[in-house]
Amino acid sequence: FAVSSVDAAKLYYECFRDQQKNSQTTQRPLKVATIFSFAANEEQDAVGDIQDESFDVSAMSSSAKEFLSAAIADYNALFKTNFSVDSNGFQNYYRDLAKQVKAKEIDLLIVVGMFLTGFDAPMLNTLFVDKNLRYHGLMQAFSRTNRIFDATKTFGNIVTFRDLEQATIDAITLF
């Protein structure tokens, strides 16, 4: 689930978490996680650029770091791990999260920019997008799900909460 900012990631994460806590269904709760490196630059978000991944958590605001710490604590409780937002702990969280996503142990991953480029997990089948994307970033993000995976997955799904039609046409035309 790609979102436009750390604040949006927090809102979605807390909403899903609260829905799971208040659910009266007999089905197992969704396993939801989040990761981000720093708040997206408003100008870059407006035009749809995807920032490079960074493991420098010192660039995060204190509220972003506090939220990420809480989300990592939830993850630690779920998977019986002991990660943190310090530099090595964050990199190890990233690696373990990638492993859990590839193993289909995470039902929903909320990201701002991380995991949208360069991450390969062919079994992923749906990308929800609530952020502006364009050109290379759009093609890279959409490609995360649009990969064939044996006979069970012949295509991926993209669900957008923003109007990305012209950006998609422009990206396909360019590439």
Model-assigned labels for residue ranges:
Residues Y12-C15, Q44-G48, D120-M123, M139-Q140, ...:
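Short acidic, glycine/serine/threonine-rich loops at helix termini
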Residues A2-V111:
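Conserved C-terminal RecA-like helicase domain
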Residues L108-V111, F115-F142, G156-T160:
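A short beta-strand element within the Helicase C-terminal
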Residues A40, A98, K102, A121-L124, ...:
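Short capping/connector residues at structural and topological boundaries
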Residues R17-K21, G48-E53, L124, F142-R147, ...:
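Generic alpha-helical propensity signal that fires on short helical segments
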Residues V6-A8, F38-E42, F115-T117, N132-Y135, ...:
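Conserved nucleotide-binding/hydrolysis micro-motifs of P-loop NTPases
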Residues D18-P29, A103-K104, A121, D130-H136, ...:
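Secondary-structure transition/capping motifs at alpha-helix termini
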Residues A103-E105, L138-F175:
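Conserved segment of the helicase C-terminal RecA-like domain
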